[in-house]
Amino acid sequence: MRMAESNKLKTGIFSGSFNPVHIGHLALANYLCEYEELDEVWFMVSPQNPLKAGTELWPDDLRLRLVELATEEYPRFRSSDFEFHLPRPSYSVHTLEKLHETYPERDFYLIIGSDNWARFDRWYQSERIIKENRILIYPRPGFPVNENGLPETVRLVHSPTFEISSTFIRQALDEKKDVRYFLHPKVWEYIREYIRQSITDN
């Protein structure tokens, strides 16, 4: 296990498709910075997996641009395309290993939902991830976590639950609903313009 060092920056790795990023993502990361004393949270956009058919992922560059817009005003947020430059498919264990190697001045904390923790044993080299990294679990409805049974490197955070999903946002947009208050204002405006431009081009 890599022991945390007080002189290193505590950096949360919030990895996801962000398809698209919404206020639930931002509010959770805000909570982790302010209440769990993370110095920064990196929104690490997961690339499209060419081996995974049938996904509804928006283009990589669009999802990354929306994360950039959503995070640029808060100094402790950072957008990241780190996984775009790794061999695919990119497993979390390899991403974390490369992060430690590239940024030795930082301590990294993997941020996952309790729904993912419930099936964490299916992750590639999950035991190694637990052994070599710190993990922060945030609550998700329907997936309680027994804090007493957690490994030393894993901790449950008591953040508010945000029952907003990217799937809901996409469906609402398909139905031409006005969901501006579910998104950062810059993200909302960019998506509106993107849709308008797509209609014009077609």
UniProtKB/Swiss-Prot annotation:
This is Probable nicotinate-nucleotide adenylyltransferase. Keywords: ATP-binding, NAD, Nucleotide-binding, Nucleotidyltransferase, Pyridine nucleotide biosynthesis, Transferase. GO terms for biological process: NAD biosynthetic process. It is an enzyme of class 2 (transferase). The gene is nadD. Pathway: Cofactor biosynthesis; NAD(+) biosynthesis; deamido-NAD(+) from nicotinate D-ribonucleotide: step 1/1. Belongs to the NadD family. Its EC number is 2.7.7.18. HAMAP family: NaMN_adenylyltr (MF_00244). The keyword Nucleotide-binding applies. The lineage of its organism: Bacteria, Pseudomonadati, Bacteroidota, Bacteroidia, Bacteroidales. The keyword DNA repair does not apply. It catalyses: nicotinate beta-D-ribonucleotide + ATP + H(+) = deamido-NAD(+) + diphosphate. GO terms for molecular function: ATP binding; nicotinamide-nucleotide adenylyltransferase activity; nicotinate-nucleotide adenylyltransferase activity. Catalyzes the reversible adenylation of nicotinate mononucleotide (NaMN) to nicotinic acid adenine dinucleotide (NaAD).
